[in-house]
Amino acid sequence: MHSAATSTYPSGKTSPAPVGTPGTEYSEYEFSNDVAVVGMACRVAGGNHNPELLWQSLLSQKSAMGEIPPMRWEPYYRRDARNEKFLKNTTSRGYFLDRLEDFDCQFFGISPKEAEQMDPQQRVSLEVASEALEDAGIPAKSLSGSDTAVFWGVNSDDYSKLVLEDLPNVEAWMGIGTAYCGVPNRISYHLNLMGPSTAVDAACASSLVAIHHGVQAIRLGESKVAIVGGVNALCGPGLTRVLDKAGAISSDGSCKSFDDDAHGYARGEGAGALVLKSLHRALLDHDNVLAVIKGSAVCQDGKTNGIMAPNSVAQQLAANNALSAANIDPHTVRYVEAHATSTPLGDPTEISAIASVYGADRPADDPCYIGSIKPNIGHLEAGAGVMGFIKAVLAIQKGVLPPQANLTKLNSRIDWKTAGVKVVQEATPWPESDPIRRAGVCSYGYGGTVSHAVIEEFSPILQPDPLGNGAVSGPGLLLLSGPQEKRLALQAKTLRDWMTAEGKDHNLSDILTTLATRRDHHDYRAALVVDDYRDAEQVLQSLANGVDHTFTTQSRVLGSDISKDVVWVFSGHGAQWPDMGKQLIHNPVFFAAIQPLDELIQAEIGLSPIELLRTGDFESSDRVQILTYVMQIGLSALLQSNGITPQAVIGHSVGEIAASVVAGALSPAEGALIVTRRALLYRQVMGKGGMILVNLPSAETEEILGSRSDLVVAIDSSPSSCVVAGDKELVAETAEALKARGVKTFTVKSDIAFHSPTLNGLVDPLRDVLAETLSPVSPNVKLYSTALADPRGQDLRDVEYWAGNMVNRVRLTSAVKAAVEDGYRLFLEVSTHPVVSHSINETLMDAGMEDFAVIPTLLRKKPTEKHILHSIAQLHCRGAEVNWAAQMPGRWATGVPTTTWMHKPIWRKIETAPLHTGLTHDVEKHTLLGQRIPVPGTDTYVYTTRLDNDTKPFPGSHPLHGTEIVPAAGLINTFLKGTGGQMLQNVVLRVPVAINAPRSVQVVVQQDQVKVVSRLIPSEPSQLDDDASWVTHTTAYWDRKVAGSEDRIDFAAVKSRLVTKLADNFSIDYLDKVGVSAMGFPWAVTEHYRNDKEMLARVDVNPAISGDAPLPWDSSSWAPVLDAATSVGSTIFPTPALRMPAQIERVEVFTSQDPPKISWLYVQEASDSVPTSHVSVVSEAGEVLAKFTAMRFSEIEGTPGVSGSMESLVHQIAWPPATPAEEPLSIETVILVSPDATTRALYAASLPTRVNSFQFSSTQEFFSNASSLPLEKGTVVTYIPGEVASLAEVPAASESFTWNLLELIKFTVNGSLPIKVFTLTANIGEGQTPTALAQSPLYGLARVIASEHPDLGTLIDVEEPVIPLSTMRYIQGADIIRINDGIARTSRFRSLPRNKLLPASEGPRLLPRPEGTYLITGGLGVLGLEVADFLVEKGARRLLLISRRALPPRRTWDQVSEDLQPTIAKIRLLESRGASVHVLPLDITKPDAVEQLTTALDRLSLPSVQGVVHAAGVLDNELVMQTTRDAFNRVLAPKIAGALALHEVFPPKSVDFFVMFSSCGNLVGFTGQASYGSGNAFLDTLATHRARLGDAAVSFQWTSWRGLGMGASTDFINAELESKGITDVTRDEAFAAWQHLAKYDMDHGVVLRSRAFEDGEPIPVSILNDIAVRRVGTVSNTSPAAAGSSDAVPTSGPELKAYLDEKIRGCVAKVLQMTAEDVDSKAALADLGVDSVMTVTLRRQLQLTLKIAVPPTLTWSHPTVSHLAVWFAEKLAK
């Protein structure tokens, strides 16, 4: 066994010490500027995946040139048919990695979904940088948080172009995923490095410049370690074609440096990495110094005869500068690694420069050798410099100059005879005449960057190991690990293969040291106890083959949220066995620990413990007691010498003595005196007593024993067992009696009744013999007592303590429980055989623990030293910290294999197609006509396109049952334009063309028929079925020409029949009522007449465009007017219903001119069995331009809540009675916290006497007294905010109330307290008083708290100051409860109440009048400007826009910055439409805002303000537990102070309307919106307050506006909305909602839609229950799977855990786009690659799968699959 000690063993052997022990200072290097290369890695063409393989390739003069892998250019062949011709003429040969796409994303915790959005250069650089660190022997985790620098050469953006040009599929992660900076930044991010992290683009000089930057960072003290390198990946043909055009590329795809046939370079790919340190630091750290960088330099070649032309003078300058920095004579440099790109101009120029610097004046027989790596591996461009550098380092290390590849004849344009340089043409030993090996490295960029470095060997060599090959001092530990379990076998195989081949000459001790001290220890670990080299090979083979081995441990560390600290448990009597110490007394550490005790004990009783251990003669109880202590002291020393230390200690019986010593409470000598003198006393009672282990809890056993004192429970072992002690015969009788009852008992090997009254007679003698011998102190390690009633008691271990320890019960259960409560989960039983491990296991399981370990130190009759290592191995594999350097202080082996990657191909599948406009349809033409493809040999042709939300061929919104569909007008326009026909017959609209998912669409024209077909585009192209998935949507027959229409409409005659003049918006309102909330096109009716069977409507297809201004779409499109025709045509029927066109007998177009902007629709109801109409499109001159004949409609069954109706969009908040729970909440104690003493007293007086209560005047007073309160299950903290007398006090009071509640929540969550927190408010819902206004933000805050921390508590809005105990107990799971009329109620969204509908005579309330002024706060914000636009559209002519920012003077508007241009443009547009726009710079939240606003209104002299819109707001999302007071107030102020300022300036009834912009986020509990939700809840209550005073005040509780404002749709917001069960709205839908609410006498309107839920999917927030709809069926009342189904859910136990684990892993896998097998149940989801957007998606997936509502913070509080499984199991149990 390894040992840190160097003292002599009893056998006389000594342990080896490494050369360069910690005492060595290396003072001669302390002030050196030298930088050491301590690690190196590479991956280049030819399978050269490490420097050693590369070296062999160099010696063999191999060239890795080959054809480019076909997949690289495949997308370009598909993109455009023309590309094939050009690609055939593009150089396709070069030096390529075999599988560039391979990446081990799981190792780095990156999901496949994110990985495919990462440039392969980032991926390969991550792996190669990791390999370099392993080669350096630097555990990556040891650099976490350090100033380590990363500099990386990179200048290829092929992958970026490939993925970013696929515009429809661009995703958020592609930005950093394809950026140059992403390469070094990704390395820094993964390793958590805080030093410089920079991408270097200096073209082909990039990576040598990166090395230079790394050297400088170390020399300047910026970083202690630098990871430097370069990478190149060739993913596309573009740059290769450029270089072909420039003549830079070799036509045969190979590099021929220095050869006469050199005619261009060949591109190569790969990566190289170096790890750098200062030489002094490297030596202190005992690093393997591969080479020393003496000097480096970078310069630019200035203005040459072309930016890409090489410059010999600049190359000489760089070399001379590097030599100068190194202070080295160029003649001492034996080898120069040249850039040598194989170009006709470049090679001679470079040789000239090298010759001038290194070859000048050299003797012919002493040349400077030169070479270049490029013919071997190609020109890696940005990675070229580092690869040349690596070659130079290898040559220095090996002492051999490798021969040049691809060299047939030296370049005749170079005068080699006088150059003083010589190309290495065969492997050449480094000349022994050189006192030190030195080399130069050149690298140049085609933009003019020139770089050079000078390196040399490091001469001190480590001495050979005195133990010789394969020897090891006793057994040792071989450690392996990986982020996933499956890696362990692979790592074992890799190491075993290496040990039997190239590693066979390495010392096993060095290998073990390397794996323990120079490698990371990941979460999955294997630890193998091995005897020698051969044994190590065999055990590794067993692990690789999945075969168990006695001394092999394999497990995962405890969960990330579980403490890895270790509790040492020293057990008592019963662990002894004869040979337990025979081996150990020969261990120097063990021997040194017990030898002083041996002398003391011999002096006390005349016996030598060491001799007893040698002979095994210690059967008597007195000797067992002494030797138990001695062994535990020796084992403790041995464990500590092997790097294990206790973080807490428990002693059991006699084990309490050693426990006290190890904890520092006693000295070893004091412990020896206690155990020895007590053992002498025990001789008086030996043979008289007995003990049995009873398989019953101690309480039950005591009941059986009764009150007798001669037979007692001596040890409370666990919740299910105890030990009984007493007279020997009585114990035997009791055992028999218990067996008769069916109770199992086991005899304890003891003849003394320890811890029983039979020892009472020994107490005083023990006091006497220990008197004045002990000087106990407080322990320095946490020490739990098993002798005291309180296991955490801090009593000194004095004489009285040991008197009690001898006779009192051993309370092991309580001690272990206390340790568990304090967070400990790892227990090490320090004994010679496990005595209490089983009991500890039982206690842990009884406490509900699942992830824990109880580990024995030794086992009876097992090799002791091996088993001690085995116990350390088990601790290590469960995550305990081990100081491996203490156990393995020797040298380390530099050749041990690095990580074996588990690669999977990851490559973004690009949806490529021709780039010309024919690929996809032109949305502005309102058709689905994409690329036209004729079918050869037929008269059939097909238009093919892709349809999704971004390519919908209409400008508006056209939802049906919550799903966007293409309007019928768009399909008809498609047929007309696609056929060129003027007539369609028998148009059958079969299935709507939905846009809810991407689909391929084809318009097929065949003879006289035309149809639209489509199929969904699957996420994986392999899932595409060529035929089966096509759906036919619409069909028709067509004719190219139609006879011109002679029909004309006599408007006067028609109007004379149409006696009823309708409101202009009749059809819009009709459609709105039946569920059509939005139009696909922006037409409007400006005149409308009807009778029973006819209609005449004047239609403007775009009223926003005035005069002759061009339309915003293709002017030839008939779709807008046809959409008006189909829509108005459906409103002629007397009974409103949701209808859509199903069949049209004939569609005719009678003109070849563009359709007019304004036309008339003449509609006639037809006589038919189904609703049918004829519609003519008529010019203003009365000419019939187009006609629908017999347009038949089918009635669509409306689905409440998901159709496009206003009823599904605008809701009220209703308060139906709450449903009580069956099981009430237990409330035993109520803690009242309120700043208002009177209110607090009133509430307290309402409590029944059976409930304990405590009162505090502030949260701080409560916190100060918390330690003395029963903060346990059954306790509720009730926060009661105070009263407020005036509106002036409201802002400050609101801030105080919300922060007090936040403090209470943080205190509860941070303390993991099982209490509930209730908030009681005073009639907020009525909104009548300043108190209600001040407390109202708590409404919003409470809902967000309930969302982030479910089941923590509830806000109850009460009518009277009475604690609503019944409500608190029985109304569970609600976020807000309102008590009205004594009834507890919870909130639900419901349709607007009909009794609130205003009489038609009153007209809408919330619309402007031309004569008034309309004020908008946040007026220059996106939403503020949209409101301004809407108000102008509805007639407003004077706007006052209030904003914190001012606009520049109008004269400078044409020169404003880009960010202001949209604002200026919008204001100019408003003014062009006749509005007068005034901008007032004013912070409405400031104390003087009222005065400033009033003064400004007087100054401006505008007509009186008739309407106010408060749209100002600030959003700063933070989780409840992370929010700060300042950040919270920053969001609250614009909402509260701003609204109150407006309230004061414009009191109730002084304006026509007072509109406030709130959010639905506080109603559904948007995660992170505690502050925003609080502010909006205030606005909601202020609206109620004003409305009760007779004001037209409304709070709009908006969902997200699509693409606009603070809630603008993003991937995260969309996912959050989806998870809450709601959708966003368009701008038009929002203002349609405004107009709809204007018809009602309401003080609020919730504007959102419920999405359609899957069958059985839980409703995520209960407030949606009444408006939520399902696609199929209704909510299932069963648990996640129907009873009796094949997927029935197990009810409990391991089966349920396995079921949930499988289901949850499946959900995670679906989100991450990986297999379920690759999801580690115990890995943090963040480590698997789950980001913030994916977290929301995962919640939805879990809800769909397990049919249980998931709170937003679940994955934060339960960060692994295992944690989630526990949570779901608890929910299922309920």
From Swiss-Prot:
Residues 32-457 form the Ketosynthase family 3 (KS3) domain. The keyword Transferase applies. Residues 926-1045 are annotated as: N-terminal hotdog fold. It comes from the Eukaryota. Gene3D superfamilies: 3.30.70.3290, 3.40.47.10, ACP-like, Malonyl-Coenzyme A Acyl Carrier Protein, domain 2, NAD(P)-binding Rossmann-like Domain, Polyketide synthase dehydratase. Residues 1403-1450 are annotated as: 2-oxoacyl reductase. Induction: In the late logarithmic growth phase. It catalyses: 3 malonyl-CoA + acetyl-CoA + NADPH + 3 H(+) = 6-methylsalicylate + 3 CO2 + NADP(+) + 4 CoA + H2O. Keywords: Antibiotic biosynthesis, Multifunctional enzyme, NADP, Phosphopantetheine, Phosphoprotein, Transferase. Residues 186-238 are annotated as: Acyltransferase. SMART domains: PKS_AT, PKS_DH, PKS_KR, PKS_KS, PKS_PP, PKS_PP_betabranch. Residues 1-21 are annotated as: Disordered. Residues 1059-1202 are annotated as: C-terminal hotdog fold. The active site is at C204, H339, H379, S653, H958, D1123. InterPro entries: Ac_transferase_dom_sf (IPR001227), ACP-like_sf (IPR036736), Acyl_transferase_dom (IPR014043), Acyl_Trfase/lysoPLipase (IPR016035), Ketoacyl_synth_AS (IPR018201), Ketoacyl_synth_C (IPR014031), Ketoacyl_synth_N (IPR014030), Malonyl_transacylase_ACP-bd (IPR016036). This multifunctional enzyme is a polyketide synthase. It catalyzes a total of 11 steps by seven different component enzymes, in the biosynthesis of the antibiotic patulin. This is 6-methylsalicylic acid synthase.
